[in-house]
């Protein structure tokens, strides 16, 4: 916007759009059965830092102030901390989040915090090592848990994203998150594409299990302030 006047966008319900997700790469180091199963080859594609920064600059001119970096797996993006630092120095950028599988988080947490990362969402579907290997195709659960602990030590706001499937022990995931004082969000797998081949657990069954353990589940009056996983 050459005039310096910031425009804004609204959705069909009149709500202001101020949030953008940027997929830095479609490559990932894991092969989750509901996302990129074993045997599917992902070409290594990265958006250049220049492209990302131009995208952010243009988005800010449209009133976008909150950004989340995703993938694939964003922590395999070369020098992601340098990209985040440049984004943080851009006028109009208020929030930078990352969604990651957490495998490389223990070695990146401090530099991500220093660069200006506001929050990290860790995708974690189980804390059982055998189930983790079945879901992801890799035996690196310990790396993810160490990454979560490192992010907590760095005082980065943290949240766990868990995809609901029949294999997922919802109560154990809640206890894990509660023990570490982390928010957890359960994500429903849609029965389309790869999702048709996965054993989906109905939301009603999850609510019944939660109410049996914790009592009546209360609804929410408004959306959470982080705009999605």
Region spans (language model):
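A short acidic, helix-capping loop that chelates divalent metal ions and anchors anionic groups
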Residues: 40-43, 128-135, 192-197
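Eukaryotic N-terminal low-complexity, Ser/Thr- and Lys/Arg-rich leader segments
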Residues: 1-2
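A C-terminal junction/extension of Radical SAM enzymes
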Residues: 171, 176-179, 183-229
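Conserved alpha-helical substructure of the radical SAM core
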Residues: 5-95
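Short, small-residue-rich loop/turn micro-motifs
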Residues: 26-28, 124-126, 188
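Radical SAM/AdoMet-radical enzyme domain recognition
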Residues: 49-68, 77-183
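Short histidine/acidic/glycine/proline-rich micro-motifs that form metal-
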Residues: 41, 74, 102-103, 164-167, ...
């Amino acid at each position: 916007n050459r005039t310096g006047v910031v425009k804004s966008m609204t959705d069909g319900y009149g709500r202001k759009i101020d949030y953008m997700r940027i997929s830095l790469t479609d490559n990932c180091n894991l092969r989750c059965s509901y996302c990129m199963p074993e045997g599917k080859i992902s070409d290594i594609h990265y958006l250049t830092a220049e492209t990302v920064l131009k995208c952010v600059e243009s988005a800010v001119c449209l009133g976008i102030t909150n950004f989340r970096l995703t993938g694939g797996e964003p922590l395999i993006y070369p020098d992601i901390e340098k990209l985040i630092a440049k984004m943080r120095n851009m006028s109009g950028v208020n929030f930078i989040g990352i969604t990651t599988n957490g495998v490389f988080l223990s070695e990146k947490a401090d530099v991500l915090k220093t660069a200006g990362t506001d929050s990290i969402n860790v995708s974690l579907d189980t804390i059982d090592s055998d189930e983790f290997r079945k879901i992801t195709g890799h035996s690196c659960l310990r790396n993810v848990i160490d990454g979560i602990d490192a992010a907590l030590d760095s005082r980065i706001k943290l949240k766990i994203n868990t995809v609901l499937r029949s294999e997922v022990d919802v109560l154990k995931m809640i206890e894990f998150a509660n023990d570490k004082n982390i928010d957890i969000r359960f994500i429903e797998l849609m029965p389309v594409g790869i999702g048709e081949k996965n054993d989906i657990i109905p939301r009603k069954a999850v609510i019944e299990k939660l109410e049996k353990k914790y009592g009546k589940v209360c609804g929410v009056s408004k959306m959470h302030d982080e705009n999605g996983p």
